Structures are given as structure tokens and as C-alpha cells.
Regions:
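Conserved beta-strand hairpin/beta-sheet module of binuclear metal-dependent hydrolase folds
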Residues: 1-57, 143-146, 150-154, 246
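Active-site environment of divalent metal-dependent phosphoester hydrolases
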Residues: 11, 47, 72-77, 99-102, ...
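Active-site metal-binding motif and surrounding structural segment of the metallo-beta-lactamase
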Residues: 36, 46-93
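Metallo-beta-lactamase
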Residues: 37, 93-214, 220-221
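Active-site neighborhood of phospho(di)ester-bond hydrolases with catalytic His/Asp-centered motifs
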Residues: 40-42, 63-72, 92-96, 152-155, ...
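Terminal amphipathic helices with adjacent charged low-complexity linkers/tails
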Residues: 211-240
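A short, charged/proline- and glycine-enriched loop
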Residues: 240-246
Length: 250
């Protein structure tokens, strides 16, 4: 299992509205499953040449068998169109919603496999289980759990715009900066969808997970996994919620 992402340490504004004082990463992962090659996520199109070099270090880019697309924002799926030039045979697995978006984005034919919630897919010697988590933070989003490795690929959940060249959370050496980036990212990306985040946490907190492969920022390992999930639950729990609709007439 390999990290093949992009480090964007000079980025200071993301999606026009988010400040990224610590830069960010666009995380992508390669899994070799016996005789099959599986790619999770891609990178922004502007970084494609650098991204291609990263991939070529570990795989033959002409022989990608599957691409798992967690969600179709350009920072996750921006290189799909160009990758199809190298591996037109690769099968793209995503939610039906994501495949619909992707067809409009790449504007070309590809082999799409619509995943189903809680469905298991055996690829080579690995088993993938898909968990639909709509509105985290797009309607097309899903997580993927690699059962043999106990790795959870989580798209935008549990991530941060925090550039860490060493990639893994054990390398974090400035906890205050990381916590600042983690909370700000949550507030901007996940915060508007708290009920959906709580539903996702109910599904994953009890799982045996050795690694959380985020879309941005450090890959979470060890105690960091449960600590970040605990923070997400605290932040997503609304105190004294009012379930009734209220209209104020001045």
C-alpha cells in the first residue's frame, strides 16, 4: 500500500473561501492486490505531471485495473480524465451519483461500476467494503474499507489542510498547529453536515481500523484515529437541539 499524493505547501487559499496557512496535500493511494492494481483518489489536474511521476515510481500507469473515486471534486478526481489516456481499460468504482457527475466531468467513455452501500468487492487478494456517507460533504461521497489491511479511506472526513511531508500522523511535531488546522477544516467542510457526520461515526467507530487514509493532511494511525473520531463526535453533537421548525416574524 503506497501514498502517491501531492504536497502543496505554498497554498494559502483553498476553494476561494478557506485559508490554508499550513498548505495542504492531495492524498492518493495505490494498493497492489495480487496481480491487480487499485488506485484510490487522484490529484488536481494542475499537478498531473508530478502526480504521474509519483505513480510511475510504484506502478505501470498503463496497467491500472481499478480506480476508486470517493467523490468527484477536482482536488480528488481532477486527474481522472488524463489517467484514462494511460489506462483506458481501468474500471472506475464510485457511487452512482459520483459516476453520473464523472461522466459530465471527463466527457468521454469509461467503464464505470456503481458501488452499493455495504457491498463487498473482491479485487485480487483484497476485499473492499463500501460505505455510503452522503453529504460528507457532497452527495456522492463514500468511504472504502480494505478488510485485510483494516484501512479506511475516508475522502474528506477526518482530514485537514495541513502539509506534512512525512505523511503519517506520528510525524506531527507541532500539535497546536495541527489542531488548529483540523478544527478549521472540520468547521468549513464537515460542520454544516453534523447529523450526517454522526451517522457516519456510528458506522465506523466500532470498527478495527489500523489506518485512516484521508483526502487531505496526515494519514491517521495509532491512537490518533480514535482521538480524531472522538473530536469529530464532540464537534458534531449539538447541545439542546431544537428539532422543531421555527419561524421568526419581525
Amino acid at each position: 500500500f503506497y501514498w502517491t499524493g501531492i504536497i502543496d505547501d505554498k497554498l494559502r487559499v483553498f476553494d476561494i473561501i478557506m485559508y490554508t496557512e499550513f498548505g495542504t496535500t492531495y492524498n492518493s493511494y495505490v494498493m497492489k492486490a495480487g496481480d491487480k492494481t487499485v488506485l484510490f483518489e487522484t490529484a488536481k489536474a494542475k499537478f498531473f505531471d508530478e502526480y504521474l511521476e509519483k505513480l510511475q515510481e510504484v506502478i505501470d500507469v498503463h496497467k491500472i485495473d481499478y480506480l476508486i473515486v470517493s467523490h468527484t471534486e477536482p482536488d480528488h478526481a481532477g486527474s481522472v480524465e488524463k489517467l484514462l489516456d494511460y489506462s483506458p481499460q481501468m474500471k472506475i468504482v464510485a457511487t452512482g451519483c459520483a459516476l453520473g457527475f464523472l461522466k459530465e466531468i471527463v466527457n468521454r467513455d469509461f467503464v464505470g461500476i456503481p458501488a452499493r452501500d455495504e457491498e463487498k468487492m473482491v479485487i485480487g487478494n483484497r476485499t473492499l467494503r463500501f460505505l455510503f456517507v452522503p453529504n460528507l460533504h457532497w452527495p456522492d461521497t463514500m468511504y472504502t474499507f480494505i478488510e485485510e489491511e483494516q484501512i479506511l479511506v475516508t475522502c474528506d472526513s477526518f482530514g485537514s489542510h495541513y502539509c506534512l511531508p512525512e505523511v503519517v500522523s506520528t510525524a506531527i511535531n507541532n500539535e497546536d498547529d495541527y489542531q488548529k488546522a483540523l478544527k478549521y477544516y472540520y468547521d468549513c467542510i464537515i460542520g454544516p453536515f453534523k447529523p450526517f457526520m454522526l451517522k457516519a461515526l456510528d458506522r465506523v467507530e466500532g470498527m478495527d481500523i489500523t489506518m485512516v487514509c484521508t483526502g487531505h493532511g496526515p494519514v491517521l494511525v495509532g491512537d490518533r484515529i480514535k482521538s480524531v473520531m472522538k473530536q469529530y463526535r464532540e464537534w458534531s453533537t449539538v447541545v439542546n437541539p431544537n428539532p422543531r421548525k421555527t419561524v421568526i416574524i419581525p
